Amino acid sequence: MEGHYAGGVKITWVLWAALAVAGAADWPGWRGVGSLGLTTETGLPVEWSAGKGVAFRTELAGTGTSSPIVVGDLVIVTSQAGSYETGDGSDPRLARDERTLAVRERAISAKGGPALELVVEAFGRRDGKRVWEYRMAATGTRPEVHEKHNLATPTPVSDGERVYAWFGNGQLVALDLKGKMIWRKDLGPFANQWGHGSSPALYKGLLVLLVDHRPAAYLLALEGKTGEVKWRVDRGKGRVSHSTPVVVAGPRGDELIVNSDQRVDAYAPGTGELLWWAGSERQTPIPSAVFADGVIYMSRGYRNSDIWAMRPGGRGEVTPLWRMANGGSYVPSILQYQGLLYMTNEVGVVTCADVATGAVVWKERLGGIFFASPVAGDGKVYLLSETGEMYVLRAGRKAEVLAKNELGERFLASPAVSGGRIYLRGDGVLFGVGGAQR
């Protein structure tokens, strides 16, 4: 089905003007501005539950693990409508942490099965009411995916004029902020055993896309206005990752950081020129890099991975500033907040480390499983577990839990924060938590 407006009714300019709200900061893409997971807003909520402190709970048109973004007065979410048939993929495997004997992970495939639709929905950030909806049929080869997610894993991104939504089969669409299609591309077929997880990134009008797949990996930049190719860089064979490229400001110019298996790479975001790299035996990283106070931090691989700290500005092969062995997170990206690093993992442990050395400041077992990346603001750190517990910690060199809030849903997507409110995306539902709207 082609794109359309909610309820089949075109949104009027009067309604659109009424939706505008001044003073709320956008959360325009994966982990917000700069992919940092940070907000400068104050008065963020501390305590809530399914019956208290929840501004709205809205059903989505489908399921997915992409995170919500906030653009103006819109909260925008992508979904897959329709389900994969759950059959083993080509290489089912037991992924096991020797300390915890973690449960088996499975890739699933759907060569047949029912028709799927890829959906982009926009909701009012005040009340959660649907403003518009765009749908397109999922075409081409259906790739294998991890059983925890589907084709709606990449988080959309917006430049304030357009929304770019990318899906795990390679389909990409640019929409205006009224839900009308501007251009569309199909970059498939995709081939990545656990499914595509990288989100699009923006740089000075360019849309940057990482396709670290077998048999060949590449990095691609498109003109945001038209979808035309600006540059493409082949990254070789056998490189697989699920991380999102992150732009950092280096002493010799901007750099695009790609956390991938085999090594970390830095590119010139305007041209795709490879600037520097650092080798590693770690495989298939999911977390994205984070850049703060002139240093790049990243978790380097699968379970029990290393943490690296690196400085931008190098050329050729470089070495990390420091490494912390076996302390990294499996899926969530690192949070750097007020001079400390925060990391969560799939066995319910949160670790706080010193930014200068990587030395552990404190470690606390909260329980649960963490796949969502942490966010922070207003002196607080927010950690969302898969089973719907949001732990609110006081930021600092001592572990202090301010609240444990439960919503009774399954959460794999990372939160978005805007206007004093936290937006949480469950499997098929969107929550707005907190009452402040600015």
Language model: regions and residue ranges:
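Generic alpha-helical secondary structure signal
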Residues: 8-9, 20, 427
